[in-house]
Amino acid sequence: MSNKLSQLKEFTTIVADTGDITAIKDFLPQDATTNPSLMLKAAQIPEYAPFLDQAVAWAKTQSNDKDQQVLDAGDKLAVIVGTEILKYVPGRISTEVDARLSFDKEATLAKARKLIALYEEAGVSRDRVLIKAASTWEGIKAAEELEKEGINCNLTLLFSFAQAQACAEAGVYLISPFVGRILDWYKKSTGQEYTAETDPGVVSVTEIYNYYKQHGYQTVVMGASFRNIGEIEQLAGCDRLTISPNLLEELKKDEGKLERKLLPTTDVKAAPAAITEAAFRWAMNEDAMATEKLSEGIRNFAADQRKLEETLRSML
């Protein structure tokens, strides 16, 4: 019998959640996703040193202002790494907008357009890139405009049904609902242990997947942030799953049978009325888990972005 990774690839598109090109070569995913934390990790890999040098050298030609050079070097590094990864994946790379812009729609638009321009200058067409932004109201509204410009988006740090509903209605290309971080919150909050079936993160993604299929939304559901392969197995059949190299390795070594869990319905119903900004904000406020995890996720990505920038600043 084939291993669970091979079986999973039969009904779910596998995405590698890493900036490590060696890992990508090992697992042959369709796509890859990066974020500020993964970029920070990648920057510490010795083989990536030339990419940092290249980004810094380029930034020096763009501005005489040190602070601007740091920002430019960060953008360029993300694009250099993304371009390199695209040599090994047939699909797309997800590159994240600076998390510090999560509540600024116009700044998110400007940063996204800049990243796409840098990719296009590097010979990478926009149809191979997904721009990642946090699923704040402002991030979702920015994505709605970007989609109209032919810039596809991946809305991340998604923890609630309200976020998923708003993303679908905005026509975003793809969402990344988090699984493991939801489980973390509930375990800490309730003190309970959960099985793969009762895992609140699995339940959340299953509900979102079924809702999207039931209403005919085209937005791709890509489960993210996994703590164990049990969560992945429960979401077998999801449109895409983005998985870290260590869990991809576990799936590859497991020769057991994998059963498909998620299937699209054929009974499509009309979509409900669109969620308003007030209703979105209220739903988020009512959901302590989603509010806390979204805030924490943005803070952590911003902190890692600052650490990466300190490294780049020291090179300027």
Curated annotation (Swiss-Prot):
Any Gene Ontology CC annotation: cytosol
Places the protein is found: Cytoplasm
Involved pathway(s): Carbohydrate degradation; pentose phosphate pathway; D-glyceraldehyde 3-phosphate and beta-D-fructose 6-phosphate from D-ribose 5-phosphate and D-xylulose 5-phosphate (non-oxidative stage): step 2/3
Active-site annotation: 132 (schiff-base intermediate with substrate)
Family membership noted in the UniProt record: Belongs to the transaldolase family. Type 1 subfamily.
HAMAP family, A to Z: Transaldolase_1
Protein name: Transaldolase
Biological classification of the source: Bacteria, Pseudomonadati, Pseudomonadota, Gammaproteobacteria, Oceanospirillales
Gene this chain is encoded by: tal
